[in-house]
Swiss-Prot record:
Its EC number is 2.7.1.130. GO terms for cellular component: plasma membrane. The gene is lpxK. The keyword Methyltransferase does not apply. This is Tetraacyldisaccharide 4'-kinase. It catalyses: a lipid A disaccharide + ATP = a lipid IVA + ADP + H(+). Transfers the gamma-phosphate of ATP to the 4'-position of a tetraacyldisaccharide 1-phosphate intermediate (termed DS-1-P) to form tetraacyldisaccharide 1,4'-bis-phosphate (lipid IVA).
Length: 335
């Protein structure tokens, strides 16, 4: 219901407005005070010895940050860098922090996005709610540039480049601060970032258009790849920030979806519940992010659909050129 108020102008907003409006004012006041404390030095912020790129957003929920992080990491690797990725591991609880993700890491310990980023890129990934501690660990392990998955509002970590990802369809909803609206910070915050990347929809002036291009479906058990429309009677589910985006992609690919089910972002799936859902069709299709949580109890008819961020060559060059400029300021070189 809350997202209907934020993004769909649901009539119930008139009932909840008197309750939520004061809370939004309080949220905004606290956020401004905390940010100002870091800016004037009343609160300490960590300056890393290597460049830091923050990929975040100003709204709650999933906007497509992780594909951007993966794209950045892969490009940096191609350029000879050794990137390290920082995440707070939302929804997870590690036995010790900072936690360095590896092939044996459980998503319940590190989080689904960190595990996905590690599996896709093989990069160094460290999880810690206190992000500067994760950065320090990655530097110890040899990283020479940092990419943070989320953390735009984590001002305890200084950054050199800020990238904001915007949902091109939903944009900023009713443009109110949490909890009345989806905003973590006012839209005026966008005036001070390096790049605004628009995921789908129409990019506004000054924004970079991004599309998420689906690949072939991959079998969770065997790694076999097929086109989605080769799979009959699909049960589709997604536990991401905005599940309808995934279902829309399947529709555009001509997938034979008989059942679709959305779950909360970062939800820890119950194997029995997923198995029961799977019995409603002949095959199961899920997002790659969900696959990292389902692999341990997957069946041989379960598939996931990987997607990759795509930009125009001009926009790619703009982003990479800015990174190169920052690296030169540090006097750094590729590994």
């Amino acid at each position: 219901m809350i997202e209907k108020i934020w993004f769909e102008n649901h009539p119930v907003k008139y009932l909840l407005w008197p309750l939520l409006w004061p809370l939004s004012l309080l949220f905004g006041a606290i956020s401004r005070r905390q940010k100002a404390a870091y800016q004037r030095g009343a609160k300490a912020s960590f300056q890393a010895s290597i460049p830091v790129i923050v990929v975040g957003n100003i709204t709650a929920g999933g906007n497509g940050k992780t594909p951007v992080v993966i794209w950045l990491v892969e490009k940096l690797q191609q350029l000879g860098f050794k990137p390290g990725v920082v995440s707070r591991g939302y929804g997870a609880k590690a036995p010790v922090y900072p936690m360095v993700v590896d092939s044996e890491s459980l998503t319940s310990h590190c989080g689904d996005e960190p595990k996905l980023i590690f599996e896709r890129t093989g990069a160094l990934v460290a999880v810690d709610p206190i992000r500067p501690n994760a950065v320090k660990r990655l530097i110890e392990l040899g990283a020479n540039i940092i990419v943070t998955d989320d953390g735009l509002q984590h001002y305890a970590l200084q950054r050199d480049i800020e990238v904001v990802v915007v949902d091109g369809q939903r944009r900023f909803g009713n443009q109110q601060l949490i909890p009345l609206g989806p905003l973590r910070e006012p839209t005026s915050r966008l005036q001070n970032v390096d790049f605004i990347i628009t995921n789908g929809g129409d990019a506004h002036q000054g924004e970079i258009a991004m599309s998420l291009m689906p690949d072939m479906a991959v079998n969770l058990m065997t790694g076999e790849k097929v086109t989605v429309n080769e799979l009959a009677s699909l049960v589709a589910f997604a536990g991401i920030g905005h599940p309808p985006r995934f279902f829309k992609t399947l529709e555009q690919l001509g997938a034979d979806v008989v059942v679709s089910q959305g779950f909360a972002d970062h939800q820890d799936f119950d194997p029995e519940a997923i198995a029961k859902l799977a019995h409603q069709g002949k095959n199961v299709i899920m997002t790659e992010k969900d696959a990292v949580k389902c692999r341990r109890f997957a069946q041989n008819n379960w598939w996931y659909l990987p997607v990759s961020a795509q930009f125009s060559s001009h926009d790619q060059q703009r982003i990479l050129q800015r990174i190169t400029e920052v690296v030169k300021e540090y006097g750094s070189s590729t590994a």
